[in-house]
Each structure stands twice: as C-alpha cells, then as structure tokens.
Swiss-Prot record:
Protein name, UniProt field: Alkanesulfonate monooxygenase
Catalysed reactions, semicolon-separated: an alkanesulfonate + FMNH2 + O2 = an aldehyde + FMN + sulfite + H2O + 2 H(+)
First-level EC class: oxidoreductase
InterPro entries: Alkanesulphonate_mOase_FMN-dep (IPR019911), Luciferase-like_dom (IPR011251), Luciferase-like_sf (IPR036661), SsuD_RutA_monooxygenase (IPR050172)
Name of the encoding gene: ssuD
Keyword NAD: no
Disulphide bridges, residue numbers: none
Length: 381
C-alpha cells in the first residue's frame, strides 16, 4: 500500500527548541512559502494548516500558497459553531476551484472552553458534536449539489444552495479526529478519513477497530490517518540527541503552565496525550521509538517517532499494517525537517507521489441572474 505523506505549515510559530524564544524564527509569508514549496518538490501529498487563535488564518494561508505550488494539497479546518455550513461550503468549493482540486478539509470542533467563548461559542462537549454533525450534513449536501432545507437543534437553513460546484467529485475529502465515543460516531457516519494522534500502536489499533465497526454499522468504509512528529537523523543516536535538544530549554514552570492549560479542555484526545507522560520528563519513550516529549508543552499531537530512516520507516509500517494510509508529519524547525524526512525517511517507504493536476474544463457562463441562478438555467427556472 502506497502511503500519503503530509507535512505541516507552522502558522503558530517555529524554532529549534520548544517552550522558549531562544532559537525561534519569524513565521511570515515568505517562510511559509519556503516550507510549502519544499513539501511540493519533495513529494508530500499535502500540508496540514492548523487553526485557532494561536494561528494565522488557515484559509488565507492556503489561498496564498496556491500560485506558488503545483501539486501540494491543503488540509484546511472547517469550524462548526464558529462558521455557518453554507458559508463554509462556498469557501470550500471556491478553494477547490481556485486550487484545481487541491483542497482537503479537516473538521475541528474545538476543545478549549475559553477559546470557544472568545469566538462566541457556548456549547458543552456533547452539544458541540451535535452541532458538528448537523453542520457536516448540510455542508456535504450543498457540495453534492443539493438545494438544502434543514431544521436541526443547532442549524436551520432554508433553500441553501451552491452555484459553483467544487472540482473534486462528489466533494473534497473530509478529515476528522476525535477520541470520544460521540466523536467516533460522527466520524463513522459522515467523514472520509479518521485521524488519530500518535499513540502507541496497540491503542491506535483499538481506536481503528472501534471506528471501523461503527462505520460498518452505517454501511460505510472510511480511511485512516495518524498525526505525528518525526525526528529522523542518519543514526539513532543522533536522532535521540536531537530529541533531547528540542526540550533542553524547557523549565518545570513552563511545563506546569502548559499542562494546566491542557487540563481545562474537555478533549478526550488531549487527556489521552497528557496521560502518556503525566507532565514528567522521565520515561518519555512510551513505545519503541515513540517519544512523548513534544506533548510536555504542545497541545494536540504530542508524540514523535525518533530514529534513523530505516527505524522510523519500520515504525510507520507498523501503523500502516493497522490500516493507516495517511501520515501527517511535522518537525522542528519545519523547513529543515521537511528536507530531512524527505531525504532520510522517504527512500525507505512506499510513498505515493502526487501528480501535478491537469486543468479541468469549466463551462463558460455569464453573470448570475438576480444572484440566484446562472444564465444557462434560465429556461428551467
């Protein structure tokens, strides 16, 4: 099975060390462009663009990278409760059209009550997933070309429609990650690829089996992916030294503050990440070559595969044997590590190298009539 390898655009900051300004670098458009172009040339399938108040806006960043890349896809967040599904569907179709079919979407429900309140969202965990399920139903139906009437608990639309369809049919693939039962049910029922953070393989296997069974109960099959950091070097010793160096500037106060911030979230996945290290520096190798040091201060994905190219490739193939075909990777600093992964790891894997998409024929059309329909449909309206 050929593997889809993704990289990451660090729109929330980058540097040589975690938890300190030392060794940091400015993250501007030019730097993000360098990373995107490196990923494009090295054969990555795409890049994940993060979302939230600590990040630059993912949609604007993705749009700005379209003209400077050729085949790279952009995995961009959809934010239920923050954005309406009709607006999000128009944005998604436009991004897909402008990129010639290089748009992918990542459903992000949010987990920090403080950040969500700042965005005007005052829903608890279960309510957010209810809203996300309704959002996704409307979003998918619009991209499928339906005119949608929907009267849910959280979302109400009447006569919603898209005039401009996406390039990818039936619609751009939808990714999603969540560890709670309600999150896995949403994944099983509506998404195309279920993402998990990089837990030990036996825990990931358990997750995949649960989601696969839930999807089968809905008559569906979905794909699987994992989100990991990578520290790959020419030798295993060099890789472990690089891992220790990454957290060498961390102090106990910074770790404690970070863990306190994570504790206020209601994310089951974040709780599972924190339990891998319990905020302590010792015993961070939680599974062969799987290191939890990143999660001491970084929210979300908090583990890294550490080793030389053949060793890390062997661990990736262990995940692939569970049914995972997509790996969303990152490393610090992201420009240098994109090259290291491409040069030291990719030769030991069966990597699916994406082709440059060919321009799609678009039917000519005049200006929309009365902001409601396109001219070629006048006779049917």
């Amino acid at each position: 099975m050929s593997l889809n390898m993704f990289w990451f655009l660090p729109t929330h900051g980058d540097g040589h060390y975690l938890g300190t300004e030392e060794g940091s670098r400015p993250v501007d458009h030019g730097y993000l462009q360098q990373i995107a172009q490196a990923a494009d040339r090295l054969g990555y399938t795409g890049v994940l663009i993060p979302t939230g108040r600590s990040c630059e806006d993912a949609w604007l960043v993705a749009a700005s990278m379209i003209p400077v890349t050729q085949r790279l896809k952009f995995l961009v967040a959809l934010r239920p409760s923050v954005t309406s599904p009709t607006v999000a569907a128009r944005q998604a179709a436009t991004l897909d059209r402008l990129s010639n079919g290089r748009a992918l979407f990542n459903l992000v429900t949010g987990s920090d009550p403080q950040e969500l309140a700042g965005d005007g969202v005052f829903l608890d965990h279960s309510e957010r997933y209810e809203a996300s399920a309704e959002f996704t139903q409307v979003w998918r139906r619009l991209l499928l070309g339906e005119t949608v009437d929907f009267n849910g608990k959280h979302i109400h639309v009447r006569g919603a429609k898209l005039l401009f369809p996406p390039i990818q049919q039936p619609y751009p693939p939808l990714y999603f990650g969540g560890s709670s039962d309600v999150a896995q049910e949403l994944a099983a029922e509506q998404v195309d690829l279920y993402l998990t953070w990089g837990e030990p393989p036996e825990l990931v296997k358990e997750k995949i089996e649960h989601v696969r069974a839930k999807a089968a109960a809905h008559g569906r099959k979905i794909r699987f992916g994992v989100r990991l950091h990578v520290i790959v070097r020419e030798t295993n010793d060099e890789a472990w030294q690089a891992a220790e160096r990454l957290i060498s500037r961390l102090d106990d106060e910074t770790i404690a503050k970070a863990q306190a911030a994570f504790a206020r979230t209601d994310s089951v996945g974040q709780q599972r990440m924190a339990a891998l290290h319990n905020g302590k520096r010792d015993n961070l190798e939680i599974s062969p070559n799987l290191w939890a040091g990143v999660g001491l201060v970084r929210g979300g994905a908090g583990t890294a595969l550490v080793g030389d190219g053949p060793t890390v490739a062997a661990r990736i193939n262990e995940y692939a044997a569970l049914g995972i075909d997509s790996f969303v990777l990152s490393g610090y600093p992201h420009l240098e590590e994109a090259y290291r992964v491409g040069e030291l790891l990719f030769p030991h894997l069966d990597v699916a190298i994406p082709e440059i998409p060919q321009p799609q024929p678009l039917n000519p059309q005049g200006e929309a009539v009365a902001n409601d329909f396109i001219p070629r449909n006048v006779a049917q309206s």
